[in-house]
A protein has these predicted regions:
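Conserved, carboxylate-rich catalytic/transport cores that coordinate ions
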Residues: 18-184
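Coiled-coil termination/hinge junctions
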Residues: 1-12, 16, 20
Length: 184
């Protein structure tokens, strides 16, 4: 008579192999399990902690998910994007607005008993990094540093702060003999 053979190929996670083997045994299937090779176009599933996973909406949007045999830089990418975002926006008031928007979106979802999308939490982190950079540079709403409260001026970092833009700053390695303004 006629004999027909059907087969399919695919990829699955290693932790599912036992289930697949059991199903094959129960159904009398032939089963061949191989590790992928460099030539295979293997889908990538990233596994990171909850904090690092917050970067996934951005990496998915940018299409920067690493290949199966590539190193996952999600943690490094999150760290550097937070630093660069804070530097680029660089104003504490913008950071407060971003953080407030993220908080409003999170609260709205919690009240509706919906899951909080990672993008909302990432927006909050972007806001916090912008607040931090605005604080260390004493940049708040474009106001001159001397118009800001003294406590904001005092917690800024002299070499990058607007408080010291027109003042001479003496780096510790010059023993007070050479000074710079932050404009130099």
């Amino acid at each position: 008579g006629n004999l027909s053979v059907a087969y399919f190929t695919g990829y699955d996670e290693e932790e599912n192999l036992l289930k697949i083997k059991e199903a094959a045994k129960e159904n009398s299937w032939g089963l061949l399990i191989e590790d992928p090779t460099e030539e295979d176009n293997v889908p990538t599933k990233l596994k990171n902690n909850k904090f690092v996973s917050l970067i996934y909406p951005l990496t998915d949007f940018l299409g920067t998910v690493p290949g199966y045999f590539e190193y996952d830089i999600s943690g490094w990418f999150l760290g550097f994007i937070l630093i660069f975002f804070g530097i680029i926006f660089g104003d504490g008031v913008y950071g407060l607005l971003l953080t407030a928007a993220a908080a409003a979106l999170i609260i709205k979802n919690k009240k509706a008993k919906k899951e909080i999308p990672p993008a909302f939490l990432l927006l909050g982190l972007f806001g916090l990094s912008t607040i931090l950079w605005g604080t260390v540079t004493c940049t708040w709403g474009g106001l001159p540093a001397e118009k800001l409260p003294q406590f904001l001026q005092s917690i800024s970092i002299p070499v990058i702060s607007n408080v010291y833009a027109d003042k001479i700053w003496y780096p510790f390695w010059t023993n007070g003999e050479a000074g710079l303004t932050t404009a130099q």
